[in-house]
């Protein structure tokens, strides 16, 4: 029997939150704008695109038992990624990234919380 080839990725699977201001940003104040969430993370994004092109993929990452983790899992499965190798950390929050974009489309600031990735160790792999 021929061995089936697949691409495996080890790394981040985040929930991304992008906010784009509708006007010049005012520091230390609430700013009107548009907010959008989507699954992200460089490794996850690459594997998603390969899956959409018909390649077999498997993601090795970590998610928490939370809304973001469930969405990351469901979105990967929806495009055919093998998500069975995900480390589930019930006491951790899933990895997340936030970017604030100014009205011209340039990033003003970004922030990430990827502490959960510390659980991806050589012993786990």
Sequence positions of predicted segments:
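Glycine-rich phosphate/adenosyl-contacting loop at the front of the ribokinase-like
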Residues: 1-62, 67-81, 97
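Short secondary-structure boundary/capping elements
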Residues: 38-45, 90, 117-121
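Short glycine-rich, polar/acidic loop-and-turn segments at beta strand-coil junctions
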Residues: 61-65, 87, 102
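Short secondary-structure capping/turn micro-motifs that flank functional sites
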Residues: 66-67, 92-93, 117
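A short, structured active-site edge motif that brings together acidic residues
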Residues: 85-94
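Conserved phosphate-binding/catalytic loop of the ribokinase/pfkB sugar-kinase fold
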Residues: 88, 99-125
């Amino acid at each position: 029997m021929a061995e089936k080839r697949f691409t495996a990725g080890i790394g981040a699977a985040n929930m991304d939150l992008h906010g784009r201001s509708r006007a010049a940003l005012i520091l230390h104040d609430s700013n009107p704008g548009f907010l959008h969430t989507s699954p992200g993370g460089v490794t996850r994004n690459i594997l998603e695109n390969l899956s959409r092109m018909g390649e077999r993929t498997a993601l090795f990452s970590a998610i928490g038992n939370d809304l973001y983790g469930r969405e990351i899992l469901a979105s990967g499965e929806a495009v055919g990624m093998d998500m069975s190798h995900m480390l589930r950390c019930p006491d951790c929050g899933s990895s997340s990234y936030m970017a604030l974009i100014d009205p011209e489309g340039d990033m003003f600031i970004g922030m990430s919380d990827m502490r959960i990735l510390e659980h991806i160790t050589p012993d786990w792999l």
